[in-house]
Curated annotation (Swiss-Prot):
Residues annotated as signal peptide: 1-18
Cellular component, GO annotation: extracellular region
Effects seen without this gene: Leads to enhanced fungal virulence, with faster decaying on infected fruits.
Domain description: The LysM (lysin motif) domains are small globular domains involved in binding chitin in eukaryotes. LysM8 contains 3 LysM domains.
Cross-referenced InterPro entries: LysM1-like, LysM_dom, LysM_dom_sf
Gene3D superfamilies, per database record: LysM domain
UniProt keyword list: Chitin-binding, Repeat, Secreted, Signal, Virulence
Compartments where found: Secreted
Record bears the keyword Transferase: no
Gene that encodes the chain: LysM8
Other facts: In plants, chitin acts as a microbe-associated molecular pattern (MAMP) that is recognized by lysin motif (LysM)-containing plant cell surface-localized pattern recognition receptors (PRRs) that activate a plethora of downstream immune responses.
Record CDD domains: LysM
Name by which UniProt lists this protein: Secreted LysM effector LysM8
Annotated family: Belongs to the secreted LysM effector family.
Amino acid sequence: MRSLQIFAFALGLCSADAYLVTPPGTPAPGAASGCSEWVQASYGLTCDIIHRFYGMTDAEFEEWNPSVSQLGDGCNLISDLYYCVQVNYVPETPTWTPPATTTASAGNGVTTPTPTQAGMAKDCNKFYLVVSGDSCYNIATAQGISLDNLYAWNSAVGSSCKDLWPDYYICVGVISGTTTSPPTTTSATTTTTTVGNGVVTPTPIQTGMSTNCNKFHLVVKGDGCYDIAAAAGVALNDFYA
């Protein structure tokens, strides 16, 4: 029976399914056809890490990637395969017809484009029209705001971006200007040269940092590993390595 399961799983790797967004490599067999974002399994990456950093439940991850529960107990990843971490849901048809023209939000004097989802911040003064394939993280990064801000200003989107609707406007800036910007690379004032590689290394640093590092980030309160890696343009796996 075990050999039949492995044979069936291998056949799944050879199947050519169509996806909403094509993965850059081999997808895990059975991955959701509506997948719009992928992560590659590599050494040190676990299902739990994926759940936490992409804001999903165990059940959602298994639903989008049924193969993780087919190779033994618990959640199992196969190195180098791509796993689905986001699915673009088709929004339900609204029961009302959005107006064709823009309207002024009551009280703040800012003209608000339509349609918008319910629960948008009343003091919003900057808007973005969502298109198919967008993700909350990509929008927040492009607009220079944090995911926390995006979720706070657009409560209908949900805390995992599951209800982000294409062709609707969301808020990406407010009048008060109280935003949390994505982390930026900052050099410490005191520096010392790392032995052997000739690169000036800022201090203080944590032990175990790569000896051939040539780019640094000063961690501030509220930083997360995923946000730092994304802002610096490096893979989360490289960051942990």
